[in-house]
Amino acid sequence: MALPKTLESVKFPVLLWRKGYSYVARDPVALCTHPRSLVEDTRRRSKEGEFMMADAGGRIYEVGEFEAVRPFGGITRIAHFLLRSVFAAPTFRSDRQPEAPEFCGIIGDAVRGRFGKTFAAEVAAAHTPQEAIELVQKRDRKAG
């Protein structure tokens, strides 16, 4: 199956966040695969405007909804199918591409609650959007 059209111009990895939650998705399959028990909550929260997303290319997206999509991702989708995961891709209300310092500050603010002020300041001081997202991705892996 093909990649959902809403993700064709998104540069991965991406950071998806809302108040009290952040998640780094390394690829479209990681972003669009949801445990069956959580997909309705994710869809409700996105409709209420709680989710934002940032990509490694420096774009900030306001997530409008997570819409069900056909499974994609080649052989990896089989594992998700066996785990009874649901595929849902984000649609966007709007997107913008702020300058790098503003972008990095937004990302720092987004992860402050999860990783603390010191790390948020480190992310905000990143020189490029790619660097900011990679810092969060590394910390996310360590945190588990």
Where on the chain are the PLM-derived regions?
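Solvent-exposed, charged interface segments at domain starts and junctions
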Residues: 1-2, 144
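Short, flexible N-terminal segments of the mature chain
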Residues: 22-57
